[in-house]
Every structure is written in structure tokens, then in C-alpha cells.
Amino acid sequence: MAKGGKSPKGKKITLNVAKNCIKITFDGRKRLDLSKMGITTFPKCILRLNEIDELDLSRNMIRKIPDSISKFQNLRWLDLHSNYIDKLPESIGQMTSLLFLNVSNNRLTTNGLPVELNQLKNIRTVNLGLNHLDSVPTTLGALKELHEVGLHDNLLTSIPAGISKLPKLKKLNVKRNPFPKPDESDMFVDSIKRLENLYLVEEKDLCSSCLQKCQQARDKLNKIRSMAPSAPRKAIFSNLVSPNSTAKESQEEWSV
């Protein structure tokens, strides 16, 4: 802590510095990488680079994200993990091109998540792990394109059934929350393994071609089951960044 109780000044990011931090990803996207630079205040100069596709401000000391972040209308990928953020701005709902949002390892509470998050209709991945959420934001239930959700290492005691009904949800991490029943998180994750429709009929009620298709599907399912490894299950959310408070490079330590 600096003299007088003030937070230490972080590295000053100028427009030229930011321009030099723009990288081209393997798929041709423009990524502005300002991670691990000791930044304490959101650098407003980067708003002039609103043509970028991806923004990485992770592993800094940022406390507040300004409303003006919505100027990044083309942004598809936003990584803010491992900062000191306790609230997201309402304007984040205007960033409708977002596909990926990582705000893990911050100081977010449920009240710090604006209802405007439900406007992110295209978002596929949201990581809210390692925060202070005591309930699941109801806004998540409106995000029908969600494939992956991280809620691990929070203060959750229950998960709304509506989350498991998200039509495209494939991966959910709710580990290390204070659920009343120790196995509740596993039971909830298992509920995502859904069947669109299930009908019980007898063989005599099926035509020969339908019966053949059912038998083929059954054989395929049995084959998949026989190939399943008997070893302990691996991380169901290991591809999302969720570092600890010291922002270590190795994410293996945080796999679940």
C-alpha cells in the first residue's frame, strides 16, 4: 500500500503501448493482450482500438470496468480473470457479439452481475468461478446459446433447475461450493446428460426398418459405454482459465 493508504500506481498504458500489444490469432482475429502488466485502472485509451476482436486484461489489479467498454461492439472474446472487480457494468449487455466471457477469480457478488447480461444472446462460454456468488444469476437461464458455464469455488448452496434446461449446455463446473449434500454437484451435472425425447414401446409395435434403427442405436450406445474409461473422471471445465489469486501460469493446479 502506498503512503497515505492509496493503492500503488500501476503501469501506464498509452495508445502506442496498446497498439504494440495487438496480436493476430491463428484464425486471423485481432487480440489486444494487456495481461500481466500491473494495470490498476482500465486504460481508456484502448477504447480507440474498438476494431479488435479479443481483449485480454487478465492478471492485473483492475477494480472497475467502465460503462464505455460497450464501445467494443465487435468484441467476441473478453478475459478479465484475476483482477479485483466486484461489479460488471450494465452496458456489458450491449456487447452482443461476445461469445466468451471470463471473469473468474475476482470479487464479484450476485448483486454485482447486472440483469443486462441476459442480452448476450450469442454467448457460448461464461466463467464466473472463484468469486463470491451466493446464488446463480437468473440471467443465465436466458442465454440459450450457452455451451459452458463455470460456477466453481463460490458460495452457492443450490442450483436452479433452469440451468440444466439450457438447450445447448454441455459443460458445467459447480465444484467446491457449500452444497448441503456433498454429491449434489455431481447429481446436477449428471442431469445435463439429457435425451430430447424418450418413448417406451414394444418391438411388435415397430416396423422392421424402425426396429433396425433402434437396434443399431442401442448397439452404438453399448459400444460407447464399453469404451468408457474406468479411471476417475477428468475435469469437466478444464479448458476455461481459472487461476488462483497469484495468477500462476500453470492451470493444471486448478483443474477439477
From Swiss-Prot:
The record ties this protein, via Gene3D superfamilies, to: Ribonuclease Inhibitor
In residue terms, where are the LRR repeats? 28-49, 51-72, 74-95, 97-118, 122-144, 145-167, 168-189, 194-215
Principal location listed in the UniProt entry: cytoplasm
Biological process (GO) annotations?
Answer: intracellular signal transduction
Task: Mention any Pfam family matching this sequence.
Answer: LRR_14
Task: State the InterPro entries in the record.
Answer: Leu-rich_rpt, Leu-rich_rpt_typical-subtyp, LRR_dom_sf, LRR_domain-containing, LRR_R13L4/SHOC2-like
The alphabetized UniProt keywords are: Cytoplasm, Leucine-rich repeat, Repeat
**Which top-level group of life is the source organism from?**
Eukaryota
GO CC annotation: cytoplasm
Record's keyword annotation contains Transferase: no
Locations listed in the record: Cytoplasm
Q: Respond yes or no to whether keyword Heme is given for this record.
A: no
Q: What does this chain do?
A: May be involved in the regulation of spermatogenesis and sperm maturation.
State the protein's name. Leucine-rich repeat-containing protein 18
Species of provenance: Rattus norvegicus (Rat)
Q: Which gene encodes it?
A: Lrrc18
